[in-house]
Amino acid sequence: MIIQIKRIFVKGEVTEGHLRIDGIQVCHTLENTHTCLFPGEYHVTLVKCKQYHRKMIIIGDSNDACEDCPQLKEVYGNTLIPQHCPMIKPGNGIHGRHDGSILVGTRSCLGCIIHPKPAFDSLYERIRKNLERGREVTLVIEE
């Protein structure tokens, strides 16, 4: 399964985009411009997250994803804050998010998305079913 994120609009610290699965648009995305992931291909897995106490959609290498969570790193300028794994998760706005996460939902206005939980749950189930069937899930981020 290929999840494609096409970034379509950048203004200030807001980066908006469209999320497609196998070419079909599923929802909108929202990222913090200063901490968003670089364009490219990433492996996607489901890992039990210590921060959220449930399985989450983790982007990138997950071998020791939660072993050092949270780890202090310089993530925004010279500010030390807990750096959690980059993941796809529900949320309404990116202000204050400096962990490279991608929020999913329906675009409402600049920098805000609505109905994040239904969009996340739908995406989570599709990824879970593909991983259970032994298929590889890849995230492709494009500018």
Language model regions located:
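Cell wall/extracellular polymer interaction/catalysis modules
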Residues: 1-137, 143
